[in-house]
């Protein structure tokens, strides 16, 4: 299941997770990968991805396993959780399905630009969604599944994710923002 190409593509996703670990409210896009040096040591059992920020010199190490063979123990500069390549979509920020790694999604033109919302913006959105009339139901935002790659990338243990803001270029109006609420699926 795991091969050199999958791990190389996954390393770019892990680069984005690294950005969120150090800067939880960063706007994520594919250009962030250029801020990091990525060292990939591929192995059939356990692959190691070492990510170093080019200017800040912070280091983070990810251990990557197939779902059938996880023997995790923390190492120096470790992320804190094993990254598991799974055969199908599963819950958990550290479980990446193999079908997301068939192509280099981060380099794709279809890769979105997105971010987590800060507490002030969440308050504003919540107040806009509330109806003044008690008889009317409040407005609901469209949902994004917790299994989506953007939600897995934005995971941060200290900042629970309630909303994801997507940014889309529009030739007429400039940048559009699209907010989605995170749906917990079971």
From Swiss-Prot:
Top-level division of the source organism's lineage: Viruses
EC number(s) recorded for this UniProt protein: 2.7.7.6
GO terms of molecular function: DNA binding; DNA-directed RNA polymerase activity
Predominant place of localization: virion
Function as written in the Swiss-Prot or TrEMBL entry: Part of the DNA-dependent RNA polymerase which catalyzes the transcription of viral DNA into RNA using the four ribonucleoside triphosphates as substrates. Responsible for the transcription of early, intermediate and late genes. DNA-dependent RNA polymerase associates with the early transcription factor (ETF), itself composed of OPG118 and OPG133, thereby allowing the early genes transcription. Late transcription, and probably also intermediate transcription, require newly synthesized RNA polymerase.
Quaternary organization: The DNA-dependent RNA polymerase used for intermediate and late genes expression consists of eight subunits Rpo30/OPG66, Rpo7/OPG90, Rpo22/OPG103, Rpo147/OPG105, Rpo18/OPG119, Rpo19/OPG131, Rpo132/OPG151 and Rpo35/OPG156. The same holoenzyme, with the addition of the transcription-specificity factor OPG109, is used for early gene expression.
Protein name: DNA-directed RNA polymerase 22 kDa subunit
Organism: Fowlpox virus (strain NVSL)
